[in-house]
Design a protein with these regions (language model features):
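Substrate-binding groove of N-acetylhexosamine-processing glycoside hydrolases
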Residues: 1-29, 150-153, 159, 199-207, ...
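Feature activates predominantly on carbohydrate-active enzymes
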Residues: 1-3, 49-265, 335-338, 343, ...
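Short, well-ordered secondary-structure micro-motifs within conserved domains or adaptor modules
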Residues: 2-4, 19-55
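Short, surface-exposed beta-strand/loop "edge" segments at domain boundaries and coil↔beta transitions
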Residues: 9-15, 36-43, 54-64, 509
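Residues that cap or initiate secondary-structure elements
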Residues: 10, 39-41, 60, 96-98, ...
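Generic preference for hydrophobic/aromatic residues in regular secondary structure cores
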Residues: 35, 78-82, 96, 136, ...
Length: 633
């Protein structure tokens, strides 16, 4: 392990450098290798000159250079990089339950700085304080103004600009559940376009965020507003095409942006959906009409987001290329947003993220897109660790600093940054890599570790997808993940997922085994299964404890209640299942009717397909009976 002497640096820079070095497992001390810094010129250069010399243009490059210093010391070779971007950013979803503590935000900032990112965007639908609207973000863990200001100031120390990503059209399910917002509501998630009260509301959002963020680059999104104009507005004013409503809304919001000095950035899917079959975003033949393009005010920057398309098929690759070409027809500055998958359940999808991201970055470089970010989301409750998808962040940095479309090896960079081999974090995917699951190119939203966890023991909608091979698979995953549970920084993530696999090695196949024993009138088998349930419940309790510890280590307490209610519901069903089995075995019940119901494929088809067991949110795992007030997020 190298020790670095920071005494030659400016004191403020040395303080931040010490925090980054500590974060990535390096030591500091006056007897260490001297670190010298020289700002000027273009790009980043790290060499051995009277210790380590870091020559950089921008502050964020210095911290990347600091992280590269150990590589230079090991090899004795100079590293020189000429980044191929204007902005390299990371989007963190803080709106689906998990809200990072300020300490966790700072930890993310230090890691982003060490990788060389210069932007950190907080996706906060209603996760910020707006005093004029006390119900906005109520009981959701919203950040106070003081917390946001603290995070912004901290990022500035490392050259990492914090930006807000908010919603000013759709994706507002959570605040709009409150009666206080009934006057600005069109449908359950979408604002009433054109209504004056809506723009008074947005004005207050802008005002309060401008008090917290120094950056005026605001990501306003306006994406996936599928029911725009189809709710209360339709009933009161009649039908207006979505394209016209979007233009009206952009004009009103644009005036507010001018008032507050905001540079607005919006998603583009709502420009494409009216002209794409099935109201989709991606297509190989959709042509956005020129009149639609011309109606987008020049003040807006546009964001093409794509987490799915890749080289999995000629059609998918062609779709990505066509979408890039369509976006180039707009007269607005273009940015690209890719995905670091962890939003389909308890485990990330690092392997697919690396596979698709390499393709996305190459496309951006070919088309000269220099504003590039990678996002992560927390759909349906933010069940995965907020630090479980780091490999993709490393890939974005390594490729864009090298400005290359060639394959890059991120293993050395990953080990230097996080103190674990890349294979460890790729192993976090294993709970979703079931034996009969889809191959990597088709595995974007595969989440068996979620739907198997929530599948009801007796009434399981998804039991048709279960295989006996899952038991040894999850037993192997349990052991594989436990290898790294002692790691200082991230051991808790491996411990939590190992505990999940310990539950699943018996729970996943329980519904299938119950059906088989019941169908065969195998009462001895049913009794053995009933006897196994208390052990599963005990394992579930242990997983719940470890999951809670993981949550509280990373996040505010808010949002945990939703998942604990779900866990408790499954626990209750297991306890009830054992009791029902005992009643049946004792002759007090004549039948267990759910076990007599034929099994069907949940998607309505009648034959297995390799890519079928994917994308099952918790509401599909059992009847829509979440307790009142518990969001599906």
């Amino acid at each position: 392990m190298f020790t670095f002497d920071l005494t030659r640096l400016d004191p403020a820079l040395a303080l931040s450098a010490a925090e980054v070095l500590d974060q990535i497992g390096a030591k500091t001390g006056e007897n260490g290798v001297p670190v010298n810094a020289k700002q000027g010129g273009e790009g980043l250069r790290v060499s051995l000159q009277d210790g380590v010399l870091i020559e950089y243009q921008h502050k964020w490059e210095f911290f990347r250079g600091l992280a590269l210093a150990r590589r230079v010391l090991r090899s004795g070779e100079t590293i020189e990089e000429h980044p191929g971007f204007y902005r390299l950013g990371f989007f963190e979803d803080l709106s689906r339950g998990a809200v990072l503590t300020v300490d966790s935000l700072k930890k993310k900032i230090r890691y982003l700085a060490a990788m060389g990112y210069n932007a950190f965007t907080l996706y906060i639908e209603d996760i910020y304080e707006v005093p004029e609207y006390p119900w906005f973000g109520h009981q959701r863990g919203r950040y106070t103004k003081a917390e946001l200001k603290e995070a912004v100031a901290y990022g500035k120390r490392f050259g990492v600009t914090l930006n807000p990503s908010l919603q000013v059209l759709g994706h507002l399910e959570m605040p709009l559940i409150w009666p206080a917002f009934k006057d600005i509501k069109d449908s359950s998630a979408v604002l009433y376009v054109g209504k004056p009260e809506v723009y008074e509301f947005i004005d207050k959002l802008f005002k309060n965020l401008c008090e917290c963020f120094e950056s005026r680059h605001f990501y306003l999104n306006m994406d996936e507003a599928h029911t725009m104009g189809l709710g209360r507005r339709l009933a009161k004013e009649g039908y207006v095409p979505k394209g016209e409503l979007l233009a009206i809304h952009m004009e009103h919001v644009g005036k507010l942006c001018e008032k507050h000095g905001i540079v607005p950035i919006i998603a583009t899917d709502m420009f494409f959906r009216p002209y794409t079959a099935g109201n989709g975003y991606y297509s190989t033949d959709t042509i956005v009409p020129q009149e639609v393009i011309d109606r987008v005010p020049e003040m807006y920057r546009i964001m093409y987001w794509d987490y799915y398309n890749c080289e999995k098929s000629e059609k998918s690759a062609a779709m990505f290329e066509h979408m890039l070409q369509q976006h180039e027809r707009f007269h607005n500055p273009l940015m690209f947003l890719g995905g670091a998958w962890k939003w389909m359940g308890f485990a990330p999808n690092n392997v697919f993220s690396l596979y698709s991201s390499d393709f996305h970055i190459n496309g951006c470089l070919r088309h000269g897109i220099d504003d590039i970010s990678v996002a992560t989301f927390g759909d349906d409750g933010s069940e995965a660790s907020m630090f479980s998808n780091l490999p993709t962040l490393v890939l974005y940095a390594e490729k864009l600093y090298k400005n290359t479309t060639e394959k890059v090896d991120i293993e050395e960079a990953f080990m230097d940054l996080f103190g674990l081999p890349l294979e460890a974090f790729l192993a976090l995917d294993c709970p979703n890599r079931i034996p009969d699951g889809p191959d990597i190119p088709n595995s974007a939203s595969a989440n068996p570790c979620k739907y198997l966890f929530y599948n009801d023991p007796l009434n399981g909608r998804l039991t048709r997808l279960v295989s006996h091979s899952y038991k040894p698979h999850f037993a192997e995953c349990e052991e594989k993940l436990a290898v790294w549970k002692a790691d200082r920084q991230f051991g808790y993530i491996f411990e939590t997922l190992s505990a999940l696999c310990r539950v699943l090695k018996n729970l996943a196949t329980l519904p299938l085994e119950l059906r088989e024993a019941y169908a065969n009138c195998d009462k001895a088998g049913l009794e053995a299964l009933a006897d196994s349930i208390p052990g599963i419940v005990s394992d579930l309790d242990d997983f719940t404890d470890k999951f809670r510890a993981q949550w509280l280590r990373e996040n505010k307490m808010f949002g945990l209640e939703t998942l604990e209610l779900r866990f408790g519901g499954q626990r209750g069903r297991l306890v009830s299942t054992e009791k029902l089995l005992r009643l049946y075995l004792d002759g007090k019940l004549d039948r267990i009717e759910p076990l007599e119901t034929p099994l069907l494929y949940p998607d309505g088809k009648d034959a297995a397909e390799p890519d079928r067991p994917v994308n099952n949110y918790v509401e599909y795992c059992y009847d829509n009976t979440l307790p009142a007030g518990v969001p599906h997020c």
